[in-house]
Amino acid sequence: MSMTDPIADMLTRIRNAGMAKHQKVDIPSSNLKVSLANLLRNEGFIKNYKVIADNKQGVLRVYLKYIDEKDHVINEIKRVSKPGGRVYVDSDGIPKVKNGLGVAVLSTSKGIITDKSAREFGIGGELICTVW
């Protein structure tokens, strides 16, 4: 079965694993997903990640982070730009997620970056998702 939106699949797997209180979740790997996992780790939304090689595309193992034993750090993770309706923003149109408490993730000419970095660089891009 072909997957039409692998990024939405990744975000859904992370959301579902967090609600089920899992410590880790395995996701089919790609360069874009690894960049997104790296950004989530740098922003403190996940503990860590690692890429496990197999004979196919590899597996991205994401280790989830919890405030205590039951509360997941990620309250909401939502896909914004979808294959059926891409959402592009310029540097002035980048949204603030929960008045700066959350993070908007953009795909730009400088790679996968946060809304704060995009404002500093003065560039826009495709609004991939929001996390808070």
From Swiss-Prot:
Keywords: Ribonucleoprotein, Ribosomal protein, RNA-binding, rRNA-binding. One of its GO terms (cellular component) is ribosome. Signal peptide: none annotated. The gene is rpsH. It comes from Geotalea daltonii (strain DSM 22248 / JCM 15807 / FRC-32) (Geobacter daltonii). The keyword Cytoplasm does not apply. PANTHER family: 40S RIBOSOMAL PROTEIN S15A. It comes from the Bacteria. HAMAP family: Ribosomal_uS8_B. The lineage of its organism: Bacteria, Pseudomonadati, Thermodesulfobacteriota, Desulfuromonadia, Geobacterales. This is Small ribosomal subunit protein uS8. One of its GO terms (biological process) is translation. Part of the 30S ribosomal subunit. Contacts proteins S5 and S12.
